[in-house]
Amino acid sequence: MNHQIHIHDSDIAFPCAPGQSVLDAALQAGIELPYSCRKGSCGNCASALLDGNITSFNGMAVRSELCTSEQVLLCGCTAASDIRIQPSSFRRLDPEARKRFTAKVYSNTLAAPDVSLLRLRLPVGKRAKFEAGQYLLIHLDDGESRSYSMANPPHESDGITLHVRHVPGGRFSTIVQQLKSGDTLEIELPFGSIALKPDDTRPLICVAGGTGFAPIKSVLDDLAKRKVQRDITLIWGARNPSGLYLPSAIDKWRKTWPQFRYIAAITDLGNVPADAHAGRVDDALRTHFGNLHDHVVHCCGSPSLVQSVRTAASDMGLLAQNFHADVFATSPTGSH
């Protein structure tokens, strides 16, 4: 039996089927709620539950330390009755926005010893409609899929650029190293909610770990295209300098924004350049900033990295609603 999900202070209601998460039900109904990892790690989908009952979805936690006493994780629960929720934001999706394409490999190069820079081209006359920071699914022949963030900005819509880290034993990590020009992949996009607002002028701190740089590159290239002027800092962390694999992007942003600040964070303490921070990205945040009350932080990386940065930012006065996360969480259906 389906139950109805009502969004507080709106006329929006949608059905939630048995065995379906509230988040999936919303997306199926064309309603976008904040989300990223869909595995309970990022906390983006936390929403107040005002009325009704829920149960766990597929054994997932319905709450985490990121939730207030009133909140539940919409990716981790299903409706056990009609419920009323109050998400931090919502919007109606364009039902025609999400598309599936057969994309061709245009080029496949190594950006770092363990990172492939994969450029895809869409069929002639087709364009990918997405927003900076969103991700796509790569559908594999066996029915599984893997998710990766678009690294190119939305105005470069005739193709897609992905940054793929080679994970030992990873399903797509093995495939990507064998792909050559002309090979095809089935892709579907876009996925993911957008937290950053292009018209926001508050100081922005972007924090990335490894290939968490990909969605941040899309965001910053988009802001540059829009000629947005704001104080922007990028903290990019890797084990060694080779993991900071796209210095040309940094150089371009320095020319775009004279006030742009870049902090490289290297954890291999025996291999730290003179101009880099020795340590983790959360350590770099604490070292180079004071009070963050008036800032916005956008963090992309592993669950542990995101959590450590979230804790540091909170300790430094950042308001919870000004921390936006894109968690690269490994799952049965893939990871960014």
From Swiss-Prot:
Pfam families according to UniProt = FAD_binding_6 (PF00970), Fer2 (PF00111), NAD_binding_1 (PF00175)
Q: How does it assemble?
A: Monomer. Part of a multicomponent enzyme system composed of a reductase (TphA1I or TphA1II) and a two-subunit oxygenase component (TphA2I or TphA2II and TphA3I or TphA3II).
Domain of life here? Answer: Bacteria
Q: What does this protein do?
A: Component of the terephthalate 1,2-dioxygenase multicomponent enzyme system which catalyzes the dioxygenation of terephthalate (TER/TPA) to 1,2-dihydroxy-3,5-cyclohexadiene-1,4-dicarboxylic acid (DCD). TphA1 probably reduces TphA2A3. It can also use 2,5-dicarboxypyridine (PDC) and 1,4-napthalenedicarboxylic acid (NDC) as substrates, and preferentially uses NADPH which is the physiological electron donor.
Q: Which cofactor does it need?
A: FAD; [2Fe-2S] cluster
A GO MF annotation of the entry reads: FAD binding
Query: What does the record note about the cofactor?
Result: Binds 1 FAD per subunit.
Q: How does activity depend on pH?
A: Optimum pH is 7. About 20% of maximum TPADO activity is observed at pH 9, whereas no activity is observed at pH 5.
Q: Which UniProt keywords apply?
A: 2Fe-2S, Dioxygenase, FAD, Flavoprotein, Iron, Iron-sulfur, Metal-binding, NAD, Oxidoreductase
Q: Where is the FAD-binding FR-type domain?
A: 98-197
Q: What class of enzyme is it?
A: oxidoreductase
Residues that, per the record, bind [2Fe-2S] cluster: 37, 42, 45, 75
- This chain belongs to the protein called Terephthalate 1,2-dioxygenase, reductase component 1
Q: Locate the 2Fe-2S ferredoxin-type domain: which residues?
A: 3-91
Species the sequence originates in? Comamonas sp
Catalytic reaction annotation: terephthalate + NADH + O2 + H(+) = (3S,4R)-3,4-dihydroxycyclohexa-1,5-diene-1,4-dicarboxylate + NAD(+)
Q: How does this protein's activity vary with temperature?
A: Optimum temperature is 30 degrees Celsius. Approximately 60% of maximum TPADO activity is observed at 15 degrees Celsius, and activity is completely lost at 50 degrees Celsius.
Matching entries from InterPro entries are given as: 2Fe-2S_ferredoxin-like_sf (IPR036010), 2Fe-2S_ferredoxin-type (IPR001041), 2Fe2S_fd_BS (IPR006058), Beta-grasp_dom_sf (IPR012675), Cbr1-like_FAD-bd_dom (IPR008333), FAD-bd_FR_type (IPR017927), Flavoprot_Pyr_Nucl_cyt_Rdtase (IPR001709), FNR_nucleotide-bd (IPR039261)
Q: One GO biological process from the UniProt record?
A: phthalate metabolic process
Give the E.C. number(s). 1.14.12.15
Among Gene3D superfamilies, the record links this protein to: 3.10.20.30, Nucleotide-binding domain of ferredoxin-NADP reductase (FNR) module, Translation factors
User: Flavoprotein: is it a keyword of this entry?
Assistant: yes
Query: By which gene is this protein encoded?
Result: tphA1I
